[in-house]
UniProtKB/Swiss-Prot annotation:
Signal peptide: none annotated. PANTHER family: UPF0234 PROTEIN YAJQ (PTHR30476:SF0). One of its GO terms (cellular component) is cytosol. Pfam families: DUF520. This is Nucleotide-binding protein CJJ81176_0398. GO terms for molecular function: nucleotide binding. Coiled coil: none annotated. The lineage of its organism: Bacteria, Pseudomonadati, Campylobacterota, Epsilonproteobacteria, Campylobacterales. Nucleotide-binding protein. Transmembrane segments: none annotated. Belongs to the YajQ family.
Length: 163
């Protein structure tokens, strides 16, 4: 039995789930009666994890956003991980939504501080886009997992490499 246990906290997104949510949103877009006759499009840039929404009506653009977010929720992706990058108007209204797939330094510090303030017998360290948490007891690690899930973060938090 190991004397120390550890796991990594990351914000990695499952690219396949992101693509599945995109496909489901496109399918719903084609079948929605309230969107018939209105030019609406949903595209996904897989490299940057950006949903590109466009519509001839600004009101329908918000409907498209709701469709995409509802599909992401159904696929297990935290809606807080989605940020609105830009909203453009003209002949077509456009909206870009980015799915965050990395822990930035601000959120990493916030998570690290919450772990330190919890007074649990664990050590945490920031390692690039991940946070490594080490403890002697697995129960302490599980308490940290619960603590991190309860934090209000704009990330899709996941736990990996529990050893």
């Amino acid at each position: 039995m190991a004397s120390e246990h550890s796991f990594d906290i990351s914000a990695a997104l499952d690219k396949q789930e992101l693509k599945n949510a995109f496909e489901q949103a496109k399918k719903e877009l084609d079948s929605r009666y309230d969107l018939k006759g209105i030019k609406c499009e949903i595209d996904l840039s897989e490299k940057e994890n950006i949903f590109k929404l466009s519509s001839s009506s600004e009101g329908k653009l918000d409907v498209l956003k709701d469709i995409v977010i509802s599909k992401l929720i159904k696929r297990g992706i935290n809606p807080n991980a989605i940020k609105e990058l830009s909203r453009e108007s003209g002949a077509m209204f456009r909206l870009n939504l980015k799915a965050n797939d990395a822990i930035d330094s601000e959120n990493a510090k916030k998570i690290n501080k919450a772990i330190k303030d919890s007074k649990l017998k664990v050590n945490s360290s920031i390692r690039g886009e991940e946070i490594r948490v080490v403890a002697k007891q697995i129960d302490d690690l599980q308490a940290v997992m619960k603590l991190v899930k309860e934090l209000d973060l704009e990330l899709n938090v996941s736990f990996k490499n529990l050893k």
